């Protein structure tokens, strides 16, 4: 059975020691969906939102969040990210925005949490910018899509 890596032998939360691990190229992709009314989505897409460019703001927020994941999640290591990308795609057929984040580095530990944090914060930023016109926006399906590098191997979500 696999054990929790952040719990020591006494059952206490502990930061994993990665000092003996070899650097490898690691990459992770995550996504989130932001469901809203067609009118709210149209406001974003037409550039009529009074707060400005929602997609640009969400993209920057996601990038900033990835870089600060170690400050937000207690046992995450500070990482020297070599790439953070946040892509936003309007999906009018389901009245949603899909947020996809990609994080990459050459290092001793994975970037899954950074990718998940980037997607989550970008989605939260969309909510924040649009809550004045619609309060019942739903953020859903935040998940890891893919990770590569490291000893646990390659993972692709089904």
From Swiss-Prot:
Pathway named in the protein's UniProt entry: Cofactor biosynthesis; molybdopterin biosynthesis
Annotated Gene3D superfamilies: Molybdopterin cofactor biosynthesis C (MoaC) domain
Binding site for substrate: 75-77, 113-114
UniProt keywords, alphabetically: Lyase, Molybdenum cofactor biosynthesis
Pfam family of the protein (one): MoaC
UniProt-listed Enzyme Commission number(s): 4.6.1.17
Domain of life, per lineage: Bacteria
GO molecular function, one term: cyclic pyranopterin monophosphate synthase activity
NCBIfam families (alphabetical): moaC, PRK09364.1
Family under the similarity heading: Belongs to the MoaC family.
The protein, known as: Cyclic pyranopterin monophosphate synthase
Source species of the chain: Histophilus somni (strain 129Pt)
Name of the gene: moaC
